[in-house]
Swiss-Prot record:
It comes from the Eukaryota. This is AA14 family lytic polysaccharide monooxygenase B. Its cofactor is Cu(2+). Residues 307-364 are annotated as: Disordered. InterPro entries: LPMO_AA14. Keywords: Copper, Disulfide bond, Glycoprotein, Metal-binding, Monooxygenase, Oxidoreductase, Secreted, Signal. Disulfide bonds join 85-108, 127-154, 171-176, 178-200, 220-236. Binds 1 copper ion per subunit. The gene is AA14B. It comes from Trametes coccinea (strain BRFM310) (Pycnoporus coccineus). GO terms for cellular component: extracellular region.
Amino acid sequence: MIPVFLAAVAAFLPLTSGHIAFWHNSMYGFNVTEQTFPYDNRPVVPLQYMTFQEWWFHNHLDYPPHPGDFFDFPAGKAATAELACNKGATTWFNSSEGGNIQNGNDPCPGSPPSEYHTTGIDDVKGCAMAIAYESDVRKIKPEDFTVFSVNQTCVWYRFTDFQVPERMPPCPPGGCHCAWFWIHSPDSGGEQIYMNGFQCNITGSTSHVPLAKPKVARRCGADPDHGKPDAVPGNCTYGAKQPLYWLQKEGNNEFDDYIAPPFYNDLYNFKDGAQNDIFVDSYPDGIPDPSPEQTIVPTPVNAAAVAAATPAPSSSGSSPSSSSPGSSSTASTTSTSGPRPSARGFRRSTGERPPTGVPTPRKSWTQTRKLRYVCLDRARIVLCCKGLALMVHRLALQRGRHQEPSAQGASLAFLAAG
């Protein structure tokens, strides 16, 4: 009885232990088993020291999903993926070799965390979702993928959320292609990379701003394990970034040492959650070339927030301080150009107190200056003339110039007439 039991356990162990994959029927190689290739090329098998064909899309391009199977990423929301050591630990267990072994949120039922390469939740290094806006998978190149979502608590849970940027544009006809990427901690197991490609779609898209061309990520975060306790923000890659292609025979874009792997976390400026600065208009002032000596840290512009905060122009032809229909009083206040006129200035020009919270259009400096010297009625005209005559008389006396008796008398007579 014991030998039979041990044989059953031995047959079961390869299916429940070791490594992790993204599981969904939209993925390439969804039904690949240990016997499909001359070598073990199941989706959970890690990738290291391989040729480009062997590691790119896990060499599963000849095992595509059904044309209509897509994984949906809702713009501005979270998409929940299933990460597990075996398909039987997911909701797709009915097509697995070992049947249903689900155990709640456990990514690797019956196995310790070392099977998914971590010593604990404090030792996880993050994973990423990347997208290529191309429906023909054969046309996609490594530099076409852009990381758009990162979960730094990965791998730890079977159900893993990936926040999607709100401004993700829609996919082309035929959909997009995405890929899940992971590089684990060096504290538990040998180093590798993980990649599972799949058909995907962006749902609920309201923006058509394209993604920027992704660049290679750079090591810039605090790295105390390798003698660098402080981050170097100037050395970071900002904006759209490529996935980390590392430790292969060819096709690498990262060349870190085996004992210092790259990660999808702050070490390479992959912030947790949606990567909201990956669009062509995210950095209107440009991005400086990264280097350890660079001191300028660019700040992305949240174009969506700016657009929402900008009031729509009024169609009534009113002044710039007028708000559009439906705008709040706050929006009207903030859209007024220049400072508000003081209460004193308001009363002087209208004779009334200014309504609370309502700005008064301020005259330009030139216009105000002109009005100071315009007399609006006959009495003021007389007063102005008297003032001018008195000014002329005083200037004449100061300069020692003598007017003709008739002119001087006329001036004095005009002053006396008042």
